[in-house]
Amino acid sequence: HIRNHFGSKPFKCNKCSYSCVNKSMLNSHLKSHSNVYQYRCADCAYATKY
């Protein structure tokens, strides 16, 4: 929580300039670089990564 106050973002993406305060946010961001769509609608062609 304290990192939010000081602007420290030690978790950095190795594929772009994104950085964040915790590892779970970085893991969520890394999905944006993936071509894997985990969630698909059973009734149509809609799919999303997260």
UniProtKB/Swiss-Prot annotation:
The protein's matches in InterPro entries, at most eight in alphabetical order, are given as: Znf_C2H2_sf, Znf_C2H2_type
ZnF (C2H2-type) ranges: 1-5, 11-33, 39-50
GO-annotated biological processes? segmentation
User: Main location per UniProt?
Assistant: nucleus
Q: Supply the SUPFAM superfamilies for this chain.
A: beta-beta-alpha zinc fingers
Q: Which PROSITE patterns match?
A: ZINC_FINGER_C2H2_1, ZINC_FINGER_C2H2_2
Q: Which domain of life is it from?
A: Eukaryota
Where does it live in the cell? Nucleus
Gene Ontology terms, MF aspect? DNA binding; zinc ion binding
Q: Which UniProt keywords apply?
A: Developmental protein, DNA-binding, Gap protein, Metal-binding, Nucleus, Repeat, Zinc, Zinc-finger
Q: Which GO terms describe its cellular component?
A: nucleus
Q: Which family does the entry's similarity section mention?
A: Belongs to the hunchback C2H2-type zinc-finger protein family.
The entry's function note states: Gap class segmentation protein that controls development of head structures.
Q: What is this protein called?
A: Protein hunchback
Annotated source species: Schultesia lampyridiformis (Firefly mimic roach)
Taxonomic lineage of the native organism: Eukaryota, Metazoa, Ecdysozoa, Arthropoda, Hexapoda
